[in-house]
Design a protein with these regions (language model features):
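The feature represents the first ordered module of a protein
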Residues: 2-65
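A short small-residue
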Residues: 66-70
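Short, compact, well-ordered microdomains
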Residues: 71-88
């Protein structure tokens, strides 16, 4: 039996300055991540001075969620385009 692997959709890092960058990584997965109903595994992060100040991700078990500063809350995923717009 052959395992189906995830397919990379995008991996992009933008440096805005010496201490500021954003990183976007999205995969299409063969089955939804635990806690999600869609076929994506993603991480979108904004990092300033070595600290993540904003992140959208869907780690297994937690499902779709958003980190802003020290806070964390649920995120309602609908499409990649809306996710990207929300991250902007």
């Amino acid at each position: 039996m052959c395992a189906v692997k995830a397919t990379l959709v995008v991996r992009h890092r933008i440096t805005y300055g010496e201490e500021l960058f954003s990183e976007v990584v999205v995969w299409v997965v063969p089955q939804p991540i635990a806690g999600c109903t869609h076929a994506y595994k993603y991480r979108l992060a904004l990092v300033a001075h070595g600290e993540c100040v904003l992140r959208y991700d869907n780690e297994a078990g937690k499902g779709d969620h958003r980190h802003a500063g020290s806070g964390e809350g649920k995120y309602r995923f609908s499409t990649l385009d809306i996710l990207f717009a929300d991250f902007e």
